Amino acid sequence: LGASVLRVRRESTDGPVIVHLADGRSFAGDELLVAAGRKPATDNLGLESVGLIPGRFIEVDESLRAVDVPDHWLYAVGDCNGRALLTHMGKYQARVAASVILGQDERDRASGDVVPRVTFTDPQVCAVGLTESQARQRGLDVRVVTYETGAVPGAYTSGEGIKGTSMLVIDQARHVIVGATFTGPGVQEVLHSETVAIAGEVPLKRLWHAVPCFPTISEVWLHLLEGYGL
């Protein structure tokens, strides 16, 4: 953003973190999160011999083939293609590439939208699929439904005063979920059910019959669907 950090200090153990910028400004916060991103380790692989530029992400198609390599014989999976820098997505891409190579064409397309991700903070933050803004940018007519995660009986097993929000992004035309975000303790364990619902394009009226156990965080499903009007 055009700003240079001069120094970062915490005056006391329980005090705020203060970030001092080179232009004289300073900002205070409870904690400081450093997220500088990652650079692809594609140097010294001989990529230049096949027309690729070393040190950059390798652009691939939905079958994980490098698009800039003639005859598309080179596959790139995992962090090196820059699609989703997550271990589980790298493993998924490897399975897709293997199915393509073996001729199992029913699984030869890697989804770029259904990417589950978890931030292991306290409380946890997790999401899968599209955000509301991403969905609208694609021309989808979406509705957002939210519910307080801490209001679910299962949340009380983590203690009183639990805070967090659960949110669904719903495609109004197809009545399916295209995105979901959860915050709160233990919500990462709910994420896979949302991933299945999005990847399978399961209609909301079918999901209504998926009964969550009491008392678990999964009961947030019921409240979200009720909030939608089911």
Locate predicted features.
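A conserved short coil-to-beta-strand element within the FAD-binding core of flavoproteins
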Residues: 1-14
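Flavin (primarily FAD) cofactor-binding/catalytic cores of flavoenzymes
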Residues: 3-6, 65-67, 130-133
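Short, hydrophobic/aromatic-rich segments at coil-to-beta transitions
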Residues: 15-18, 141
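Short, acidic, Ser/Thr-enriched surface-loop or helix-capping motifs
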Residues: 21, 61-62, 171-172
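Glycine-centered tight beta-turn/hairpin loop motif at sheet-sheet or coil-to-beta transitions
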Residues: 22-24, 161
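FAD-site-proximal beta/loop scaffold in flavoenzymes
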Residues: 26-104
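Active-site-proximal substrate-binding core of FAD-dependent oxidoreductases
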Residues: 82, 100-131, 211-213
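Flexible, glycine-rich terminal cap/loop adjacent to redox cofactors
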Residues: 121-230
